Structure formats: C-alpha cells, structure tokens
Amino acid sequence: MSFSDFSKVESIKSLNEFLADKSYIDGTTATQADVTVYKAFQKEFPQFTRWFNHIASFTEEFEDLPAGKAPAASGSAAAAAEEEDDEDVDLFGSDDEVDEEAEKLKQQRLAEYAAKKAAKGPKPAAKSIVTLDVKPWDDETDLDELLTNVKAIEMEGLTWGAHQWIPVGFGIKKLQINLVVEDALVSLDDLQAAVEEDEDHVQSTDIAAMQKL
C-alpha cells in the first residue's frame, strides 16, 4: 500500500489503521518504504514532525516535566497563516532547515542530559558476593599451600574474604571461600580458570552461591 500524500486527514487515518498490526510499512524490518512515508509526512507536516521527534527525546522524564498549558490556535493566527499561504510564502522552510533545527534541539537535549548526569556523579559500582568451592585432588594435597595460592590471585575489583574447610568424604576437605567482585571488572570464568591453573593442588572449582550487593 502506498502512503505518499498526506494533504488529507483521511490519509493519516488510513496509515494509522494500516499500522495497527505492523511495525513497518513493508516486511519485518525498516526499508526505504518506511523512509518514503516518513518523508512524505514530514513534508506535509514539518513542524509537527519536528515537535514530535523533539518531545520523544523526553520520554524517560515525562513524569518529571513541569505543568503547562496547551495553547489553542487563535482565529487571527489561522487567518494570518492562510493569507501568507495565499501569497506563496514558505511558512516552514525547507526540509533541510527542519532537520537542522531538530538536530540542534537534539544536541541541546543531549548536552542537558549529560550535564544533569554529571551533576549527580557516578553511580556506585555493581558488586556481587560469591562463594567459591575449590576441590583438591585427594587427602594428601597440601591445603595450606592451596589456600595461599588462591589468595595470591589478584584482579582489579576482586576482594577475598573468609574461608572454611568442608569435609567431602574419605578424609578430603574442600576449600569454601567468600569473595566480593565488581561485576564490570571481574569475570568469574576467568577467576575460576586462574584458580584451576594451580594443577598441583586444585582438581576443580564451582560457584556455590552468588548474590548481588
């Protein structure tokens, strides 16, 4: 279906109904068909398009915006617009001018958002507390050396905590040790691999528990 002329309200209603069960004009992804319809609408309603795109940038802050009054179009303003239209005066400017103004408003909005975010300061780093099980080879494994080697592992964002020895049978004890990690800095897979590099003492490792702080 073609939507290239929005000079009539019926065309807008038809497009709205057409998109009731669709996200795109044609197919399941954005295509030139969407671009054509968008530009046709923008050409017919450039100021509305600019306003709509600009207000859409405030979506996450709708609830925080101050109260305001929606002005009604006055008769004199409508008459003046009609008169200027009769004189072939371009009320809205070119599409390039609209795009430039919209881009300017967008950049201004991004700058305001960045300033507000900077004023709030950085968010605290997300952290998790992890309980790691480290299993030795047998009952003859030197557990003190095993523990020393584990705690010798250093990573940015890693803090070792308390530990205990848990009997698993046949005289074998596994190391259960707590640690705190910064989620963005420490990969638990990399940490387990580092612990398991101690092949003389470590048979395997498991994440016994994990909880966000």
Swiss-Prot record:
Biased composition (Low complexity): 67-80
GO CC annotation, single: eukaryotic translation elongation factor 1 complex
SMART domains named in the record: EF-1_beta_acid (SM01182), EF1_GNE (SM00888)
CDD domains: EF1B
Gene Ontology molecular function: guanyl-nucleotide exchange factor activity; translation elongation factor activity
SUPFAM superfamilies attached to this UniProt entry: eEF-1beta-like, GST C-terminal domain-like
UniProtKB keywords: Elongation factor, Protein biosynthesis
Quaternary structure (record): EF-1 is composed of 4 subunits: alpha, beta, delta, and gamma.
Biological role stated in the UniProt entry: EF-1-beta and EF-1-delta stimulate the exchange of GDP bound to EF-1-alpha to GTP.
Family: Belongs to the EF-1-beta/EF-1-delta family.
The protein, known as: Elongation factor 1-beta
Lineage of the organism: Eukaryota, Fungi, Dikarya, Ascomycota, Saccharomycotina
